[in-house]
């Protein structure tokens, strides 16, 4: 599951989209004095932060402003996002998570590169848009901090068994993939009967305006959904059956493209689900994937308290000279190599990809011709000499497919678990809103109430 354990470029690109708006912030030159719009435990959200975040969202809908919800609803959605970011950053700091200046600078360099400019050029663009560079740096630092919090959450709580991978692989090789959208009307934990009734009325009202053709599903998602991906039209991306909760999977298989089902009741609230389109998973799989593997053997001389650097280097040089003088590599390895894992096998490492023992070791192996022996080189383990025995092309399609499926299942579990974690974090926090909130159903059409059952389908990374 390393794919979602590391900070990926998409995170940086997402940040760059948020903080480089299309429309100029100079339109907001005459701003009132800053004030607090929300108190979040020991932190605050300022009006300037909220205005800037709303402006950035609107800039991504230039020419499609009709898809946005009313300003007061958008304000509530964006403010809730900012509150969750504050809570996650605070929890990360409590957990000892820190973002170094080097990591932050690297992220900002990537953002600048994505915008086809230098860091200085990026700074000038931000200033021209009315955004101070220190504020931008802090925003990027917060984004990375939140990512590290999710990363640690995944490492400590998410487990994917080989059996789960086997089942999902069988489905992927014989099934379809489904492009889904959803709309969520959320419910708090321990919701009262009155809260449930209000949520049912709201979700049925949303379904009614969609059925009547008054709003497209995408526009309704942006306008009314409580899901974190509401402003992305509730898009859940492409999913195979293993990525869909069991309570929904059977139903999705019977749906036709364009069909909408729901309301469906789950632990997060009520939701509507739309099947956008279906595709053959084998068509999406792509060509077979081949990789070069190497067969080699090596001799290792370790550096220890008793065997210092100079002694280890002198010993490896002596062994290299013996082999150059005609001694058998395997015999020398059995007699003198200090790698207990393979010295008895004459230092044989078997077949391996070039990065199996680190990039530097792999580069030395790749630089050799078959049968040749390297000069001594240093690694973290000590001093080596290596003999390359052969190369081969290996089909790693299935291995990579298993890794991708393992990542996909892990990501689905992470989304489900992290969504629950965020709800708990929000419910346990002291949050005082210093801004007028619109009523939940102020802009939401109503309809007759009919209960529904089902699971929760969380937002997921698009494929």
From Swiss-Prot:
<dbReference type="InterPro" id="IPR050280">
    <property type="entry name" value="OMP_Chaperone_SurA"/>
</dbReference>
<protein>
    <recommendedName>
        <fullName>Chaperone SurA</fullName>
        <ecNumber>5.2.1.8</ecNumber>
    </recommendedName>
</protein>
<dbReference type="Pfam" id="PF09312">
    <property type="entry name" value="SurA_N"/>
</dbReference>
<dbReference type="GO" id="GO:0042277">
    <property type="term" value="F:peptide binding"/>
</dbReference>
<comment type="function">
    <text>Chaperone involved in the correct folding and assembly of outer membrane proteins. Recognizes specific patterns of aromatic residues and the orientation of their side chains, which are found more frequently in integral outer membrane proteins. May act in both early periplasmic and late outer membrane-associated steps of protein maturation.</text>
</comment>
<dbReference type="GO" id="GO:0043165">
    <property type="term" value="P:Gram-negative-bacterium-type cell outer membrane assembly"/>
</dbReference>
<feature type="region of interest" description="Disordered">
    <location>
        <begin position="439"/>
        <end position="463"/>
    </location>
</feature>
<keyword id="KW-0413">Isomerase</keyword>
<dbReference type="InterPro" id="IPR027304">
    <property type="entry name" value="Trigger_fact/SurA_dom_sf"/>
</dbReference>
<keyword id="KW-0697">Rotamase</keyword>
<dbReference type="InterPro" id="IPR023034">
    <property type="entry name" value="PPIase_SurA"/>
</dbReference>
<feature type="signal peptide">
    <location>
        <begin position="1"/>
        <end position="25"/>
    </location>
</feature>
<keyword id="KW-0574">Periplasm</keyword>
<dbReference type="GO" id="GO:0050821">
    <property type="term" value="P:protein stabilization"/>
</dbReference>
<keyword id="KW-0677">Repeat</keyword>
<keyword id="KW-0143">Chaperone</keyword>
<feature type="domain" description="PpiC 1">
    <location>
        <begin position="175"/>
        <end position="277"/>
    </location>
</feature>
<dbReference type="InterPro" id="IPR046357">
    <property type="entry name" value="PPIase_dom_sf"/>
</dbReference>
<dbReference type="GO" id="GO:0030288">
    <property type="term" value="C:outer membrane-bounded periplasmic space"/>
</dbReference>
<dbReference type="InterPro" id="IPR015391">
    <property type="entry name" value="SurA_N"/>
</dbReference>
<feature type="domain" description="PpiC 2">
    <location>
        <begin position="291"/>
        <end position="390"/>
    </location>
</feature>
<dbReference type="GO" id="GO:0051082">
    <property type="term" value="F:unfolded protein binding"/>
</dbReference>
<dbReference type="GO" id="GO:0003755">
    <property type="term" value="F:peptidyl-prolyl cis-trans isomerase activity"/>
</dbReference>
<dbReference type="GO" id="GO:0006457">
    <property type="term" value="P:protein folding"/>
</dbReference>
<dbReference type="Pfam" id="PF13616">
    <property type="entry name" value="Rotamase_3"/>
</dbReference>
<dbReference type="Pfam" id="PF00639">
    <property type="entry name" value="Rotamase"/>
</dbReference>
<keyword id="KW-0732">Signal</keyword>
<dbReference type="InterPro" id="IPR000297">
    <property type="entry name" value="PPIase_PpiC"/>
</dbReference>
